[in-house]
Amino acid sequence: MLLSLVRCSTKRQWAISSTGIRLLSISSPFLSTGSSNSDFLMNLSGSTRSSKHNNLHNNDRTPINKYKSNHGPKKVHSNYQLETKIQPKKMHQSTKFKKFSIKWTTGSERAQKAANEVFQKILGLSPNGVIKALNLETNEIETSSIFQFAKGIDLDRHGFIIANVERTTDHKKIPLVKLIEARVALRRYSDKVADRKQKELIDLGVIKSSKKYDNEKEKVGIKHIRVSWKIKETDLAKQKTNEIQSALKKGHKLCIYLDDKTRTNTDWVDDFTIPAENSNKKISKREKLNRTAILDAVKSLLEEEDTFLSFEGNIENRMLIKSTPKTLSTSKNKEALDEKKVLKEQKKQERREKLRLRTEKKQDTVT
């Protein structure tokens, strides 16, 4: 005998049966256009219990056929269907795990692929689907679920991206999801696909590496670290200190950004600007002492290793500290000198060859 349960409220209706959970009539306040109430099916049925265990609770369960005949829910159309596939369990797993697959009913095939790629990234960061999104009704960022957020999205008009990833106190990741225009989502997806194909062809040796690809390889060795002017002493002494020291030990170049703003977008590095020299804003003496202490602490960490340091900006606004390992710079200088020597040697050989040809011509004319 199987369990069937119906729970109703003003905002949401659940129907739990042996085939899974059916979620009905949940309006999403995170969409810019008013979407009608819709339903989607989540086949979340796991591995069945043993028959002996089921027989112990037969008295508490009602037949599923009886529920279907009396309480069949109305069918409502949705912009996508969310399904799960039960994957075979691995040797070290005690239970089977589930993988989501989405079938969108709106948007082109390419738009659906772009949405699915972002959807899978979100589930990779937050397996239970917990996200943060902007509620356009209250104009505030609220905690929600990607399943509720994606419900009713018209891919012909909108797409969605991961704008930022926040970490909780228990080290869990919560993606900040943002709605964007459909054409922007398609362009971003096309650029990513093109970059992936180009890298594959370069790795296979089919095409030569471009300057853009070489610059990206160089940027891999650069570590970007943010330090807020309002950081706590404990966080600076533990988290940021470990982050800076580990990057220095690995021989990375460092760019440390000191700012008083909490940036929520993923492109905060590109948005960071150095203020003009005359744009010093007034801060209190206490704030200035606090910022000076933070700057001195960061400088002392960087000076522990053999590095070149450069400073941009000012303590009243924001600052950028660049750290380059001296060993890296000296090795680059050696490579540059070696290249110059090779070029000089080539030029000498060319001159000798020209002289030899001239002398041979003169001898031929004399004879």
Swiss-Prot record:
Chief localization class?
Answer: mitochondrion
Descriptive protein name: Altered inheritance of mitochondria protein 23, mitochondrial
Question: Which cellular compartments is it found in?
Answer: Mitochondrion
Q: Which gene encodes it?
A: AIM23
Highest taxon above the source species: Eukaryota
Quick one: where's region Disordered?
A: 326-367
Homology family: Belongs to the AIM23 family.
Which segment is the transit peptide? 1-31
Q: Which UniProt keywords apply?
A: Mitochondrion, Transit peptide
Which residue stretches does the UniProt record annotate as biased composition, category Basic and acidic residues?
A: 332-367
One GO process term, biological-process aspect: mitochondrial translational initiation
- Pfam families for the chain: mIF3 (PF14877)
> Which GO cellular component term is one of those annotated?
mitochondrion
GO molecular function annotations of the record: mitochondrial ribosome binding
The species this protein was found in? Vanderwaltozyma polyspora (strain ATCC 22028 / DSM 70294 / BCRC 21397 / CBS 2163 / NBRC 10782 / NRRL Y-8283 / UCD 57-17) (Kluyveromyces polysporus)
